[in-house]
């Protein structure tokens, strides 16, 4: 599969060959679902906590006698039926974390990259940086490729200047080639990849797959 490499001015420069084992797979939507669900679950703090009837502070005294008042029966003021009483089956702190098998996670990332590459969502840009670190300079580049869409920028290294220039753009997020996130890739309307990052992504997943198979 070939993709056109664009300059920062939006001019087509050359073609780059995308690795079919990473960018040309049939899309497995099942593993994509599990990968996104895992990421979102792992972000949950799980700190929600309510008090049950036995934990609410208060007297255990019966508020009035059982019979003869014409009112409903009451055991104590901590009843879940009363304001300020305990909560029935309320949430308690819990751990929502669950880890996907590494092989499944890699398949999800490759499926997402293939999904974006097979459409028009993925664009390859020549390597560049924003020397000034200014947002306006990065916007001049982005306006050729994304018009206010939710955009993901995949970098080949930790470019502090480029990230500084983009941190004021709410629709833009940066990912490293070896730390992709399924949620960002799936919901990104545009995926911009630096040319070097394309090769690094392919090398990274090839080496991981080879290590898994015992051939690396």
Swiss-Prot record:
Alphabetically, the GO molecular function entries are: rRNA binding; structural constituent of ribosome
Cited InterPro entries:
Ribosomal_uL4 (IPR002136), Ribosomal_uL4-like (IPR013005), Ribosomal_uL4_dom_sf (IPR023574)
A Pfam family that the UniProt record links to this protein: Ribosomal_L4
Signal peptide location in the record?
A: none
Spell out where the chain crosses the membrane: none
Give the compositionally biased regions (Basic residues).
64-76
User: What Gene Ontology terms describe where this protein resides (cellular component)?
Assistant: ribonucleoprotein complex; ribosome
Q: Which GO BP terms, alphabetically?
A: translation
Supply the alphabetized keyword list. Answer: Ribonucleoprotein, Ribosomal protein, RNA-binding, rRNA-binding
Query: Region labeled Disordered — which residues?
Result: 51-78
Q: Which family, according to the similarity comment?
A: Belongs to the universal ribosomal protein uL4 family.
Q: What does this protein do?
A: One of the primary rRNA binding proteins, this protein initially binds near the 5'-end of the 23S rRNA. It is important during the early stages of 50S assembly. It makes multiple contacts with different domains of the 23S rRNA in the assembled 50S subunit and ribosome. Forms part of the polypeptide exit tunnel.
Q: Assembly state and interactors?
A: Part of the 50S ribosomal subunit.
Record's protein name: Large ribosomal subunit protein uL4
Q: Which organism is it from?
A: Treponema pallidum (strain Nichols)
